[in-house]
Structures are given as C-alpha cells and as structure tokens.
C-alpha cells in the first residue's frame, strides 16, 4: 500500500493551529491544549509507524521478487519406520499381548475356552 491510497484529513500542524470558538458556557483552553498535544504526538507516531511499515513492505516485496523460485520435489516422508520400533513386528506385539493377558487374567482364559 502506498500513501496515495490513504486520504489524510489533518496534519500535526493543522491540529496544532486549530482555533476553537467558545460558546455560552465555553471550555477550558488548557484542557483543550493538553488534549490536542496528546493527539498531535499520537498522530506523529502513527505517521512514522505508517512510513516505517510502508518502507518495510517495499523492502519485503523487492526481496520476494528477487528470491529464486523454489519448488519442492522431495518425496513425502514415510512414517512406516516410525510406526514400528526397530525389531518389533506384529508377531512380537501379539506375543507380548498374549503374555500380558495371561498375567492379568491368569487361568481364567483357559477355563473359558
């Protein structure tokens, strides 16, 4: 985004130089001045932040334009090796399960058969 895409209605200087009319009850000029001072500081900070972000955006776009196109042609990793630890097969798992059942249930399994 460029600064041309934003329409600014006020500048810090315009805020500083703004004159307010007083009404019947008026206002406290010191309160207005203090408030406007805060607005001016914030406005200046926002302007600096916008300029910094625009500069960073331009830099990143240029960096992206200059970066080589990367294609990922690596094969997808296989999870088969991670699923079974070394030396463990389905037979080993079934054998361990059988031993565990015998230990937990004891002879109750043999009586039910």
Curated annotation (Swiss-Prot):
Coiled coil regions in record: 36-68
GO biological process assignments: cell division; regulation of cell shape
Keyword hit for NADP: no
Keyword Secreted listed: no
A GO-annotated cellular component: cytoplasm
InterPro entries for this protein: Cell_cycle_GpsB, DivIVA_domain, DivIVA_fam
Chief location bin: cytoplasm
Subcellular location: Cytoplasm
Gene3D superfamilies documented for this protein: 6.10.250.660
Keyword annotations of the record: Cell cycle, Cell division, Cell shape, Coiled coil, Cytoplasm
Subunit structure: Forms polymers through the coiled coil domains. Interacts with PBP1, MreC and EzrA.
Similarity comment: family membership: Belongs to the GpsB family.
NCBIfam families registered for this protein in UniProt: DivI1A_domain (TIGR03544), PRK14127.1 (NF010725)
Function in brief: Divisome component that associates with the complex late in its assembly, after the Z-ring is formed, and is dependent on DivIC and PBP2B for its recruitment to the divisome. Together with EzrA, is a key component of the system that regulates PBP1 localization during cell cycle progression. Its main role could be the removal of PBP1 from the cell pole after pole maturation is completed. Also contributes to the recruitment of PBP1 to the division complex. Not essential for septum formation.
Protein name (database record): Cell cycle protein GpsB
Species name: Listeria innocua serovar 6a (strain ATCC BAA-680 / CLIP 11262)
Taxon lineage: Bacteria, Bacillati, Bacillota, Bacilli, Bacillales
């Amino acid at each position: 985004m460029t600064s041309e895409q934003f329409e600014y209605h006020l500048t810090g200087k315009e805020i500083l130089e703004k004159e307010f009319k007083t009404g019947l009850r008026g206002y406290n000029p010191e309160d207005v001045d203090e408030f406007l001072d805060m607005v001016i500081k914030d406005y200046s900070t926002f302007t600096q932040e916008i300029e910094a972000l625009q500069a960073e955006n331009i830099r990143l776009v240029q960096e992206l334009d200059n970066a080589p196109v990367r294609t990922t042609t690596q094969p997808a990793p296989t999870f088969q090796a991670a699923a079974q630890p070394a030396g463990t097969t389905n037979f080993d798992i079934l054998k361990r399960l059988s031993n565990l059942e015998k230990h937990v249930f004891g002879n109750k399994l043999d009586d039910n058969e």
